[in-house]
Amino acid sequence: MVGNAEAPITPEVIEGYRTMGALAEDEALMALDGRTDAPDNRRAVRPFSDNCGFTLAEGAVYTILMDDTLALELGLMIHGSVANVFVNSDGFKKSIPGPGVGNYVTVAKAMALARRLLGDEGLRRRSYFQAHGTSTPQNRVTESHIMSALAGIFGVEDWPVAAIKAYVGHSLAPAGGDQLAAVLG
């Protein structure tokens, strides 16, 4: 079993993210929408549009991983398979202002594996990108660049992109689990 839970909706955590300028604040939302009366909080999180930050979420996501043979023996419904794991972080860099080479390497390795498993046509026509999508202006620019650059290299012209944080907020530690649950359904 792998997973995580976090309940970050506390004054200290909110103030920390507010100080970093990472939260979608009412004033910034109204400025984006040209409003003076009240923000449209239903549109607060906009990963790849004009945006000003994210909303915090609380969450808990746990996933059961097991050998495929055991899952079949137990008659379990299999939702997916982990073909590989790619972690090529940059350690020394500031992740918010700009992605380091590790981010590009991680996505490129995952795309190369998808191409090996699905073929060129499968990667180009039957794949999609589950974005980190925090909805901060910095993330919009850097993540968009990673996706665009690698889509070009791999010949992906029309790549559907989803970002679950736009619907559930940023749960911090469990955010990867939120993304996995969104992918597997």
What are the functions of these language-model segments?
Residues V2-C52, V85-P99, G133-R140, D158-G185:
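Acyl-CoA/ACP chain-elongation machinery
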Residues A28-Y128:
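Condensing-enzyme catalytic core mediating Claisen C-C bond formation in acyl metabolism
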Residues G102-T106, H145, D178:
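A general alpha-helical scaffold signature found inside nucleotide-binding enzyme cores
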